[in-house]
């Protein structure tokens, strides 16, 4: 057997036999006896590790892998230190402490005792260790094994302690507040047996035992510098200074916090015990709190909406609602979707409205009409009873609210009819009459022919034409209503002292009727839209009861004139002057077939029809009507303007602010401004629907009708747009080129507007041109309602009075007109043209702007309140301002920076597209730019073709379904809002042309191509109009091209407004007009309904066309901007 020296010292090694006296013994398997281990050193044995020992002469099998068997190792190791019984092959059983085992599993027991043995060894000799070779061991048994023994009694961490009852103990003791005892003198010593010593005892012992007396003074006097407190003046000053300094330090919030922390109740902050509340009680409280918060939030939202109701709407959808102006408060809110045609009962000049209210008639109805016309889609009837008007008469406001038709769908809104003077006033608003803006003219038939001043409630329920763009105009409209024009007028219609006459009377509530004829017509943007656009008659001839074919007469006093208005619109071409005369009484009243909120299908259908009907210049039918209407309106406006000029000017300024608003807003703003400004003026000319009775009445209040008997309230919004278009258009139409291009129109309008508004009649009713109030006939402005979806042209037909080619002339003439507008009372020949804007859209907004400006006379900006409209409005406003003064042009504000956001008078009527430049805008030399001055800058040479491309939404998906989407209509429906409106707004606000207002849709430049309608798949209205300008002039905006995508925040310095003539002065001369190249004016109208993709095919190269043909790209700013 091998003996290892190691085994002597390492029992675990297998060990050598131990002597009888002890030590390490090795069990001999052969004779079952223990042999003492041999202490002499021998060959190193492997017993400690994996070595194999031999028992006797036999070679023991090696237990391999003992250490490799983790489970075995774990079990065996766990037994180390435990008492085990080892059963041997011989039958002997040993019991001892399991000490260790080797790699071959030789087992070492400590203090073994043989429990059972065949051959009993000497019992007196117990070895200290015995090593049992693996081959002799049968089994090992551990008895009474405690697996936790090794760790039992060890210190437990706090975590281990807390695990037992952490939050799980239910039998907690009831907590009781601590009571200090009766005297509060209880012993609060923590440990009475503290192993410490008392300092006083120390001092005593030192003194008594050691004779050492301590000098310690517990007063700490020796540790601080004693103060020499004296009565000297120096001490007092030093003390006061110290106290002041101390007070500053102590009053420091940080110092206070620290002191509170140090001196505060630490227990309450850090150690107090707080029982968790019952779960259900806690949940109930939380639920209540949540409900309270929700309720508060709803109330805040409601209040905010109510407050906003007085402000111009912010978004196309919302702005309509908001545009409801203060009507939010008084009138049901509109839904976000396309709003029903704006019945817009809003007392149009608040003053007028108030006055009518006294009469029990609401002139206000007209007020919104025009603006609504533009914004029609969005602003639902949002009966824009101006707050003033509404406030004045509860019933009226409720009627308006009803008219609003919360659904905002295109549907006729029925208003309660309020009998005025015993007559039922129905705001018949022809549904969707694109030109229907005139619908307003239901005149309260107080027996008052005009119904303006008297009870003739000319509820011009102007169902706003609903254009995709209309939303803006509506907003604008709402704004133009300006909360209550009466506010503007400083009272219900303080403007005309008489306005108050009706103040006390409730506004008659009207039902808005949709006229079937008008409904579909409203979208006819082509020449056919007469009934709607062209037709929104200003029932100029009282005697033409039949005229009102499109919309049932809103006869309130049986004023056929209202009925006639539509027909008369048609006739108005023939008898614009008649309208002027008649306008006084019936004109405003003729309800125009107004566009009511219509379904997408209707809109699409109208758009398609418009696309088909759209002609560059061919359609003259509606413009004439509008022209005549406008002349009347213009006359009225002029009259009103003359009277209200001062007020108008003020409002024009407001309008300027508003002008930044998107086209619809512009229209609305224009309208509002017109209403506001016109309010004094009576909105006669400017608020298309407003011109209601405004002709004669220079009401400051939007309800021009009330001021002057205006049976025909301005046709409602559609008309408003048309009217606006007419006004500006007519103003432009003087130039007769409105068809040319919206931009040009807008410019022209702006340019003309100031003058034309001065002499809006000049164009429209050239006879009326003189702003004499005497020409009472309010020409209803029937701006052809811009196509709902197709921004390009509703006025295409409108274009027409002047041959569409006149569009070219419109641009130049706009300048001329602008220059000459004031002088020319006889622009009426152009009225037809006027009716139509080249793009119709622009023209509409422009017209609206013009009308508003005209009404406002001093609100060029107001005119620009819509983006496009704004510019036109600005021009118009300038003109209007001028008109207001009579022939005197009003100085127009203009801002130099077209790109600047600030012209985002978004506050304006919920401008869906503030005219602020869109980031993608690509400045391009713009041939025709509308300058803030309102004068027309010959942006594109007259020969320049204008490309009217409907602008896609900013970032619209390739297939922009918006054309068909009514909901988008609210914002997208800004036909007018297209580039021109944006342009106009920018121009108006900044005084400098806006190069590219929004993301540019792919522009296809079709040089020299005659007007082309590009209908994006379903979006017929999306015509691209190529307006060849007669003159090749190019207006180069310096370097505009360099800033391709100016950010709205960064003005394009490159573009500086081309020379801007003052509204009074002639139109601006083109900054640069190289006759060599033909310029193409590319107008990107923002047509929400039109799919931008169709334009995608052509390359957008026109943006920067450095090549010969310069393309003027007016990018409409995205409405979202």
Swiss-Prot record:
Domain of life: Eukaryota
Basic and acidic residues composition bias: residue spans: 274-310
Any single GO BP term: stress granule assembly
Predominant localisation class: cytoplasm
Residues bearing the modification Phosphoserine: 219, 232
Classification via Pfam families: LsmAD, SM-ATX
Keyword tRNA-binding (UniProt): no
Biased composition (Gly residues): 12-22, 367-376, 434-448
Compositionally biased residues, Pro residues: 774-789, 914-926, 1048-1062
Keyword terms, alphabetized: Cytoplasm, Developmental protein, Phosphoprotein
Domain Sm intervals: 71-146
Annotated region described as Disordered, given as residue ranges: 1-53, 270-376, 422-458, 476-935, 1039-1076
Compositional bias annotation for Basic residues: 1-10
Stretches with biased composition (Polar residues): 27-36, 323-347, 476-487, 499-524
Gene Ontology MF terms in the entry: mRNA binding
Low complexity bias (residue ranges): 37-47, 552-596, 623-684, 697-711, 720-773, 807-825, 835-890
Subcellular location: Cytoplasm
GO cellular component: cytoplasm; cytoplasmic stress granule
InterPro entries reported for this sequence: ATXN2-like (IPR045117), LsmAD_domain (IPR009604), Sm (IPR047575), SM_dom_ATX (IPR025852)
Family statement: Belongs to the ataxin-2 family.
Entry function: Regulator of actin filament formation, though it does not directly assemble with actin filaments. Required for oocyte specification and oocyte positioning in the female germline. Also required for normal eye development and bristle morphology.
Protein name (database record): Ataxin-2 homolog
Source organism of the structure: Drosophila pseudoobscura pseudoobscura (Fruit fly)
Lineage: Eukaryota, Metazoa, Ecdysozoa, Arthropoda, Hexapoda
């Amino acid at each position: 057997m091998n003996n290892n020296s190691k085994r002597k010292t390492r029992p675990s090694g297998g060990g050598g036999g131990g002597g009888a006296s002890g030590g390490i013994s090795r069990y001999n398997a052969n004779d079952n006896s223990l042999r003492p281990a041999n202490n002499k050193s021998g060959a190193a044995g492997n017993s400690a590790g994996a070595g194999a020992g031999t028992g006797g002469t036999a070679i023991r099998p090696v237990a391999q892998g003992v250490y490799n068997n983790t489970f075995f190792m774990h079990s065996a190791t766990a037994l180390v230190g435990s008492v085990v019984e080892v059963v041997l092959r011989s039958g002997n059983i040993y019991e001892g402490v399991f000490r260790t085992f080797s790699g071959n599993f030789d087992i070492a027991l400590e203090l073994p005792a043989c429990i059972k043995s065949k051959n009993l060894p000497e019992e007196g000799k117990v070895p200290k260790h015995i090593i049992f070779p693996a081959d002799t061991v049968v089994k090992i048994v551990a008895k009474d094994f405690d697996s936790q023994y090794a760790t039992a009694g060890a210190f437990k961490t706090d975590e281990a302690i807390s695990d037992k009852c952490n939050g799980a103990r239910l039998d907690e003791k009831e907590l009781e507040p601590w009571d200090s005892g009766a005297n509060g003198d209880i012993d609060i010593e923590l440990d009475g047996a503290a192993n410490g010593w008392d300092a006083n005892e120390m001092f005593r012992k030192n003194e008594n035992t050691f004779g050492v007396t301590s000098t310690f003074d517990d007063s700490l006097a020796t540790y601080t510098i004693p103060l020499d407190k004296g009565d000297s003046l120096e001490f007092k000053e030093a003390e006061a200074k110290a106290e002041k300094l101390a007070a500053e330090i102590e009053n420091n919030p940080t110092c206070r916090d620290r002191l509170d922390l140090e001196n505060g109740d630490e227990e309450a902050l850090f150690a107090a015990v707080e029982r968790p509340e019952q779960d259900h009680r806690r949940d109930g409280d939380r639920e209540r709190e949540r409900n309270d918060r929700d309720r508060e939030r709803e109330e805040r939202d409601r209040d905010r909406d109510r407050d906003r109701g007085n402000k111009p709407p912010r978004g196309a959808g919302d702005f309509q609602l908001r545009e409801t102006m203060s009507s939010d408060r008084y009138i049901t809110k509109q839904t976000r979707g396309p709003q029903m045609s704006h019945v817009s009962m809003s007392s149009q000049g608040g003053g007028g409205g108030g006055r009518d209210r006294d009469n029990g008639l609401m002139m206000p109805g007209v007020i919104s009409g025009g603006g609504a016309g533009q914004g029609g889609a969005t602003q639902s009837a949002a009966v824009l009873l101006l707050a003033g008007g509404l406030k004045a008469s509860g019933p009226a406001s409720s009627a308006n609210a009803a008219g609003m038709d919360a659904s905002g769908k295109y549907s006729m809104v029925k208003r309660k009819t309020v009998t005025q003077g015993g007559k039922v006033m129905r705001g018949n608003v022809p549904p969707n009459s694109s030109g229907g803006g005139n619908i307003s003219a239901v005149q309260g038939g107080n027996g008052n022919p005009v119904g303006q001043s008297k009870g003739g409630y000319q509820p011009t329920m102007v169902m706003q034409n609903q254009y995709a763009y209309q939303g803006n105009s509506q907003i604008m409209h709402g704004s133009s209503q300006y909360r209550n024009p009466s506010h503007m007028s400083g009272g219900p219609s303080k403007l005309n002292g008489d306005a108050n006459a009706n103040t006390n009377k409730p506004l008659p509530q009207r039902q808005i009727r949709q006229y079937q004829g008008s409904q579909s017509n409203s979208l006819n943007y082509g020449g056919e839209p007469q009934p709607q656009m062209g037709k929104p008659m200003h029932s100029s001839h009282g005697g033409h009861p039949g005229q009102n074919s499109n919309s049932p007469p809103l006869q309130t006093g049986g004023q056929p004139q209202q009925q006639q208005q539509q027909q008369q619109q048609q006739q108005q071409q023939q008898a614009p002057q008649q309208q002027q005369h008649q306008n006084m009484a019936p004109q405003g009243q003729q309800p125009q077939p107004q566009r009511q909120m219509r379904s997408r299908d209707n809109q699409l259908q109208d758009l398609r029809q418009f696309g088909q009907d759209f002609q560059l210049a061919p359609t003259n039918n509606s413009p004439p009507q509008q022209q005549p209407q406008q002349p009347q309106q213009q006359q009225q406006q002029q009259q009103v303007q003359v009277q209200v000029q001062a007020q108008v000017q003020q409002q024009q300024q407001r309008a300027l602010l508003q002008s930044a608003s998107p086209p619809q807003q512009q229209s609305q703003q224009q309208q509002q401004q017109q209403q506001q400004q016109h309010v004094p003026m009576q909105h006669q000319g400017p608020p298309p629907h407003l011109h209601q009775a405004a002709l004669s009445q220079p009401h400051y209040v939007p309800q021009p009708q009330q001021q002057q008997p205006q049976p025909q309230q301005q046709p409602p919004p559609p008309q408003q747009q048309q009217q606006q278009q007419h006004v500006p258009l007519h103003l432009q139409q003087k130039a007769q080129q409105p068809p040319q291009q919206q931009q040009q129109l807008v410019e022209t309008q702006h340019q003309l507007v100031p003058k034309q508004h001065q002499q809006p009649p000049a164009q429209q009713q050239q006879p009326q041109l003189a702003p004499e109030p005497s020409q009472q006939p309010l020409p209803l402005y029937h701006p052809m309602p811009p196509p709902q979806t197709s921004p390009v042209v509703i006025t295409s037909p409108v274009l027409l009075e002047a041959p569409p080619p006149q569009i070219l002339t419109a641009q130049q003439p706009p300048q001329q007109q602008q220059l000459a507008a004031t002088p020319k009372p006889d622009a009426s020949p152009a009225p037809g043209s006027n009716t139509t804007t080249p793009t119709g859209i622009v023209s509409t907004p422009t017209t609206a702007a013009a009308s508003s400006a005209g009404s406002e006379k001093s609100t060029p900006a107001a005119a620009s309140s819509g983006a496009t409209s704004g510019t036109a409005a600005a021009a118009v406003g300038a003109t209007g301002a001028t008109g207001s003064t009579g022939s005197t042009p009003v100085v127009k504000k203009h801002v130099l920076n077209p790109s600047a956001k600030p012209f985002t008078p978004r506050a304006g009527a919920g401008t869906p597209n503030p005219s602020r430049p869109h980031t993608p805008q690509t400045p391009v030399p713009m041939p025709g730019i509308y300058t803030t001055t309102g004068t027309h800058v010959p942006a594109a040479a007259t020969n320049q073709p204008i490309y009217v491309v409907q602008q896609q939404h900013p970032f619209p998906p390739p297939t922009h379904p918006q054309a068909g989407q009514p909901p988008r209509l609210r914002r997208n429906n800004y036909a007018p809002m297209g580039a021109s409106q944006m342009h106009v707004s920018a121009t108006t606000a900044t005084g400098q042309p806006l190069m590219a207002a929004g993301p540019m849709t792919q522009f296809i430049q079709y040089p020299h191509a005659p007007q082309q309608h590009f209908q994006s798949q379903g979006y017929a209205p999306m015509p691209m109009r190529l307006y060849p300008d007669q003159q090749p002039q190019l207006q180069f905006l310096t370097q505009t091209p360099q800033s391709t995508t100016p950010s709205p925040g960064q003005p394009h310095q490159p573009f500086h407004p081309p020379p801007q003539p003052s509204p009074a002065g002639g139109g601006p001369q083109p900054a640069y007009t190289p006759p060599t190249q033909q310029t193409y004016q590319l107008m990107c109208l923002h047509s929400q309904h039109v799919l931008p993709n169709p334009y995608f095919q052509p390359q957008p190269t026109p943006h920067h066309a450095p090549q010969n043909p310069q393309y003027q790209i007016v990018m409409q700013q995205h409405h979202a901007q």
